[in-house]
């Protein structure tokens, strides 16, 4: 039997293989079957047809697993072939890609005529048809050459076959997975399907050409001892479709869903997604403007009632809420630039003044309405800033469970101004406006007025005759009572409760309330507060010419933290200028009306201001008296502490003769002196103990001597 090597150049001698390359991947290797026909493979073809009838229910185009399972993807060399043809396989030098062809090695029994006792495939061939085919191949082998393709030895497969033979099939399930493991480098691809086999089987039956012997293969189920289902540990769909998870040949439901979503996203003709409609703020403003225009007449009537109620509430609550004069064109600011707390006090005027302004100018009322709207918006914004305020009404604040905060409790004590009057937790809108007016005036006055610290005022001192602190008349540090801060042109002989204006907030840290004055400054542009005084009070202004007064008041003076008592204002000539109440009110009213364009009388203002000042005078008098008493006690404490430091300094030898010594140095030297005296005391105490011990010893010695002397006298006598 002539054996040919698998080298394509050694096979080209025959004209039948002149146009065929065995290792050409593009050509089907089984095209050789048209030229190579043999009667020895009839049994294998019949087995293949039988298996086709069994697996005809499977769709070959849908799933490739049945074909791969029943049709050989690889042709591993069997143990019988590997035993005898291992050397030839290594000589051939074929790589692992040789498993791509579907021609396996011929068994040892077919080549040499001998049988392998351990071959499972030789034991399984018991049919008569197979034996007759084998005998026909042996007899006709001399005439027709047999082409054998050799492969490299698969050591893993050889070991598995040996284990299977030696175990005798007892551990079939355990070795089955090892047998079907795909060796590294093995190919799962195939070059034909079952349809080609069925088509080519008819052509092979009638052709008479070179005999082609197929080797023993593991795909024949009846030839194997225990044929099992062919399974791989790799998903074979990756070899066909390029993915391990997606089946492109399945139903197109997912593809249809994706296409539908893509069309929906690419369709630009549809309306956008419906969302919650948010109207623009301009629509709301238009509605508010229409409503304000429709209710303009009612607001003019309500404005007059609001002013009357405000005046009554101000009189009852003891607050001075007289409006500041409107500014001129040069001093006016834009509505946007005005502070929100100014809007509440800017729209309130006297009854006659409001009537005149409404009848003469309708634009003023519209501006006031706009200011009210702006103020309400600002207050709503203020509601979200803090959780507690004295200046907000009840309906705008949600205090939750009404828990008492530290600012509501009685634990908050004002040391400077302790009084029995307490503000309500949530005042009404009118009280809120009054408080805002007062606080804004206080802040604006403090910032706008440039006042000297000490300026022409007297410091009356209440002598504390009952104080245990000794007098400091002989001290080098006299008290403020004996040394006023600055000489004044005229002094107040006595203290009068009604002589002090009541416009201060109770929590102010100044020792006496500052007298409010109607001031306008050419260098300071802004709004100034004006207040009306009682008859007999003095008015102080900054560069303001008043009718009926010949002299010009130089400037206003504010009370400092250490001042108390009645304020006296010096003029340029050094004399005071008392002005009557009527002249004062008329001058200010005329000034207001000249700037606002209205004409108002001062009769109603006079009566309301008088009532306010009388009520506020008695209330503030008690508060000022308590504040003065507290300041006196504090002053006495400071004087007593100063005297104690002076006495301590006299006891220290190192700084006794110094005229001035800081308190820190006095304390440091006193500490050193105390330590020195303590050490001296300890030394003296130890010395006393030693001396007492020596005295005791000497007394004992003296007593012993006396006893001896007495004994000697008694013996001699």
Swiss-Prot record:
Probably targeted for ubiquitination by the SFC ubiquitin ligase complex member ago, leading to its proteasomal degradation. Pfam families: HLH. Disruption phenotype: RNAi-mediated knockdown in the neurons, only dopaminergic neurons or only adult neurons increases transcription of the dopamine decarboxylase Ddc and thereby dopamine concentration. In addition, induces male courtship propensity towards other males without altering male sexual preference towards females. RNAi-mediated knockdown in muscle or fat body does not elicit male-male courtship. Simultaneous knockdown of Ddc and myc restores increased dopamine levels and the induced male-male courtship observed in the single myc knockdown. SMART domains: HLH (SM00353). GO terms for cellular component: cytoplasm; histone locus body; nucleolus; nucleus; protein-containing complex. Induction: Negatively regulated post-translationally by mei-P26 in a proteasome-dependent manner. InterPro entries: bHLH_dom, HLH_DNA-bd_sf, Myc_transcription_factors. Residues 298-311, 361-376, 489-523 have a biased composition (Low complexity). Residues 639-677 are annotated as: Helix-loop-helix motif. Low levels detected throughout embryo before cellular blastoderm formation, particularly concentrated in pole plasm. Zygotic expression detected during cellular blastoderm stage in endodermal anlagen of anterior and posterior midgut at both poles. After gastrulation, expression detected in invaginating ventral furrow of mesoderm. Continued expression in anterior and posterior midgut and mesoderm during germband extension. During late germ-band retraction, expression remains detectable in fusing midgut and presumed developing somatic musculature. The modification Phosphothreonine is found at residue 217. GO terms for biological process: cell competition in a multicellular organism; cellular response to insulin stimulus; cellular response to nutrient; DNA endoreduplication; embryonic pattern specification; insulin receptor signaling pathway; lipid homeostasis; negative regulation of peptidoglycan recognition protein signaling pathway. The modification Phosphoserine is found at residue 220. Keywords: Activator, Cytoplasm, DNA-binding, Nucleus, Phosphoprotein, Transcription, Transcription regulation, Ubl conjugation. The keyword Signal does not apply. It is found in: Nucleus; Nucleus, Nucleolus; Cytoplasm. CDD domains: bHLHzip_Myc. Residues 288-376, 462-535, 555-584 are annotated as: Disordered. It comes from the Eukaryota. Belongs to the Myc transcription factor family. Participates in the regulation of gene transcription. Binds DNA in a non-specific manner, yet also specifically recognizes the core sequence CAC[GA]TG. Seems to activate the transcription of growth-related genes; required for cellular proliferation and growth. Functions in the TORC2-mediated regulation of cell growth, acting downstream of the TORC2 complex. Inhibits the demethylase activity of Lid. Activates transcription of mbm. Has a role in ribosome biogenesis and endoreplication in fat body cells by activating the transcription of LTV1. Efficient DNA binding requires dimerization with another bHLH protein. Binds DNA as a heterodimer with Max. Interacts with ago. Interacts with lid. Part of a complex containing lid, Myc and ash2. Component of a complex with pont and rept. Interacts with puf. Interacts with wh/wuho; the interaction may be mediated by mei-P26 and may be involved in the regulation of ribosome biogenesis. This is Myc proto-oncogene protein. The lineage of its organism: Eukaryota, Metazoa, Ecdysozoa, Arthropoda, Hexapoda.
């Amino acid at each position: 039997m002539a054996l040919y090597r698998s080298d394509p150049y050694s096979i080209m001698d025959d004209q039948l293989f002149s146009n065929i390359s065995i290792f050409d991947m593009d050509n089907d290797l089984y095209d050789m079957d048209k030229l190579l026909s043999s009667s020895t493979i009839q049994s294998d073809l019949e087995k293949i047809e039988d298996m086709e009838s069994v697996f005809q229910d499977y769709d070959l185009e849908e799933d490739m697993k049945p074909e791969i399972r029943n049709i050989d993807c690889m042709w591993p060399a069997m143990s019988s072939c590997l035993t005898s043809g291992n050397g030839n396989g290594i000589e051939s030098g074929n790589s692992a890609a040789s498993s791509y062809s579907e021609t396996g090695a011929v068994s040892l029994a077919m080549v040499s005529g001998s049988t392998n006792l351990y071959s499972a495939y030789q034991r399984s061939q018991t049919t008569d048809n197979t034996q007759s085919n084998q005998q026909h191949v042996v007899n006709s082998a001399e005439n027709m050459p047999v082409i054998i393709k050799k492969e490299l030895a698969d050591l893993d497969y050889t070991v598995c076959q040996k284990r299977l033979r030696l175990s005798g099939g007892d551990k079939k399930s355990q070795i089955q997975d090892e047998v079907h493991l795909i060796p590294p480098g093995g190919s799962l691809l195939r070059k034909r399907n079952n349809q080609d086999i069925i088509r080519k089987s008819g052509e092979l039956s009638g052709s008479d050409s070179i005999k082609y012997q197929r080797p023993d293969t593991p795909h024949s189920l009846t030839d194997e001892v225990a044929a099992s289902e062919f399974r791989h540990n790799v998903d074979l769909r990756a070899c066909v479709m390029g993915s391990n998870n997606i089946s492109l040949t399945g139903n197109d439901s997912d593809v249809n869903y994706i296409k539908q979503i893509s069309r929906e996203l690419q369709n630009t003709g549809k309306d956008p997604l419906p969302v919650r409609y948010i109207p623009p703020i301009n629509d709301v403003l238009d509605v508010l403007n229409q409503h304000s225009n429709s209710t303009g007449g009612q607001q003019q009537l309500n404005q007059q009632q609001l002013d009357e109620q405000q005046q009554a509430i101000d009189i009852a609550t003891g607050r001075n809420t007289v409006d500041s004069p409107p500014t001129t064109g040069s001093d006016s600011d834009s509505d946007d630039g005005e502070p929100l707390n100014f809007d509440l006090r800017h729209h309130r005027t006297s009854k006659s003044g409001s009537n005149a302004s409404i009848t003469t100018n309708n634009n003023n009322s519209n501006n006031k309405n706009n200011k009210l709207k702006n103020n309400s918006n600002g207050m709503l914004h203020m509601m979200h800033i803090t959780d507690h305020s004295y200046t907000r009404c009840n309906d705008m604040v949600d205090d939750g469970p009404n828990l008492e905060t530290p600012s509501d409790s009685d634990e908050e004590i004002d040391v400077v101004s302790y009084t029995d009057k307490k503000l309500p937790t949530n005042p009404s809108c009118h009280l809120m406006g009054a408080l805002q007016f007062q606080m804004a005036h206080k802040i604006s006055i403090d910032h706008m007025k440039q006042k000297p610290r000490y300026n022409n005022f007297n410091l009356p001192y209440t002598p504390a005759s009952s104080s245990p602190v000794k007098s400091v008349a002989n001290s080098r540090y006299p008290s403020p009572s004996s040394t006023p801060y600055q000489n004044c042109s005229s002094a107040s002989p006595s203290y009068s409760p009604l002589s002090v204006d009541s416009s201060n907030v109770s929590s102010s840290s100044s020792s006496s309330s500052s007298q409010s004055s109607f001031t306008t400054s050419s260098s300071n542009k802004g709004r100034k507060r004006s207040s009306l005084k009682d008859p007999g009070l003095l008015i102080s202004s900054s560069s303001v010419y008043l009718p009926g007064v010949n002299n010009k008041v130089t400037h206003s003076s504010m009370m400092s933290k250490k001042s108390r008592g009645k304020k006296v204002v010096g003029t340029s000539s050094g004399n005071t200028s008392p002005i009557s109440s009527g002249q004062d009110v008329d001058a200010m009213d005329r000034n207001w009306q000249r700037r606002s364009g209205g004409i108002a009388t001062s009769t109603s203002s006079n009566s309301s201001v008088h009532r306010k000042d009388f009520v506020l005078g008695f209330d503030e008098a008690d508060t000022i008296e308590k504040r003065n008493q507290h300041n006196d006690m504090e002053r006495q404490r400071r004087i007593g502490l100063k005297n104690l430091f002076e006495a301590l300094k006299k006891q220290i030898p190192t700084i006794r003769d110094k005229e001035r010594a800081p308190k820190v140095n006095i304390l440091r030297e006193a500490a050193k002196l105390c330590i020195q005296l303590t050490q001296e005391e300890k030394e003296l105490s130890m010395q006393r103990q030693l001396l007492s011990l020596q005295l005791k010893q000497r007394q004992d010695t003296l007593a012993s001597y006396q006893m001896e002397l007495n004994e000697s006298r008694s013996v001699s006598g």
